[in-house]
């Protein structure tokens, strides 16, 4: 009888333990599913809200979409208001592309140095620096650019201050450099050792191995890092606003002042009446930013699919 009771007790404990594990699994699934649904709902709600607000200037206020995207005139407070945002679209693309042209070579070169040239101590030295740069707030970058970079650039201009497209480009290139470097370093470190060993076995030097074997193998991921950096640069507002000048005209040179979509939105949104034409056109500019973010995401997914192939 005692053995039977002990066997029943053991079996009951096993059943109870199994039921508890099943309950824990169900709870875990429910929590994860709820979090995923909240994220999806928030993303959909933001997209719908921004889409509805962004389209009101065209559907309700009668602003021409063609004029909005192609006109060079932005003067919403004039007696004959103009709502052309082409200078700001150009400024956003210009500062993004130029900053990527500066940060991409430096970031990829830094990643190669960390993983291939000095793998033992390079990462120990550079990784904390990269993490420090990532953690610095945008306003600090902007303040340093305003107090150091802008006066320096002003020395090379015949008139005016040093606020310019060049200042915004340099500040943004420093801001996106950690993103490009860290992702590129992970890409280089994830390459199989057989690539390096096979190249060395064929008599290639370290530089030949890096240039002709490793970089081509990691190229899709390296481009993903660059695109992620560009996506951050395109959406940055505060740091750029402090140094770029925020003018309404197309810049003719890197030393000219400029404006971007994000800087104009942050400068003007608080000074407009909710629901007014100017307010709705600012929401339309936000919709343009959202569309560009989707395009960056699609480009990243395309590059990621190439990497898997």
Curated annotation (Swiss-Prot):
Domain of life assignment: Bacteria
TM region positions: 30-50, 88-108, 133-153, 165-185, 214-234, 280-300
Biological process per Gene Ontology, one example term: phosphate ion transmembrane transport
Keywords: Cell membrane, Membrane, Transmembrane, Transmembrane helix, Transport
Main location class: membrane
Subcellular location: Cell membrane
Membrane topology: Multi-pass membrane protein
Domain ABC transmembrane type-1: residue ranges: 89-300
Molecular function per GO: phosphate transmembrane transporter activity
Keyword Methyltransferase recorded: no
Gene Ontology CC terms: plasma membrane
PROSITE patterns: ABC_TM1
Similarity comment: Belongs to the binding-protein-dependent transport system permease family. CysTW subfamily.
Function: Part of the binding-protein-dependent transport system YqgGHIJK. Probably responsible for the translocation of the substrate across the membrane.
NCBIfam families from the UniProt entry: phosphate_pstC
Protein name in the entry: Probable ABC transporter permease protein YqgH
Protein species of origin: Bacillus subtilis (strain 168)
């Amino acid at each position: 009888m005692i053995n039977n009771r002990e066997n029943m007790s053991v079996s009951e404990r096993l059943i109870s333990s199994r039921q508890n594990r099943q309950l824990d699994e169900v709870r875990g699934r429910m929590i994860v599913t709820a979090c995923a649904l909240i994220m999806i709902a928030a993303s959909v709600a933001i997209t719908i809200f921004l889409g509805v607000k962004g389209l009101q200037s065209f559907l309700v206020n009668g602003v021409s979409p063609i004029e909005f995207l192609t006109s060079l005139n932005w003067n919403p407070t004039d007696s004959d208001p103009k709502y052309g945002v082409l200078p700001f679209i150009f400024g956003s693309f210009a500062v993004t592309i130029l900053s990527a042209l500066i940060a991409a070579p430096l970031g990829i070169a830094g990643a190669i140095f960390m993983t291939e040239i000095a793998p033992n101590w390079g990462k120990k030295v550079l990784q904390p620096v990269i993490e420090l740069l990532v953690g610095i707030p945008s306003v600090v970058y902007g303040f340093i650019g305003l107090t150091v970079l802008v006066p320096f650039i002003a020395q090379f201009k015949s008139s005016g201050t040093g606020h310019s497209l060049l200042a915004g480009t340099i500040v943004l290139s420093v801001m996106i450099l950690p993103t490009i470097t860290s992702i590129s370093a992970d890409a280089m470190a994830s390459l199989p050792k057989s690539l390096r060993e096979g190249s060395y076995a064929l008599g290639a030097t370290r530089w030949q191995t890096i240039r002709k074997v490793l970089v081509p193998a990691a190229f899709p991921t390296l481009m993903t890092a660059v695109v992620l950096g560009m996506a951050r640069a395109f959406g940055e507002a505060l740091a750029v606003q402090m140094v770029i000048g925020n003018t309404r005209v197309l810049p003719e040179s890197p030393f000219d002042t400029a404006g971007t979509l994000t800087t104009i939105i942050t400068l003007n949104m608080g000074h407009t009446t909710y629901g007014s034409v100017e307010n709705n056109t600012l929401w339309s500019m936000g919709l343009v930013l959202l569309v560009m973010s989707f395009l960056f995401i699609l480009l990243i997914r395309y590059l990621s699919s190439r990497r898997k192939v």
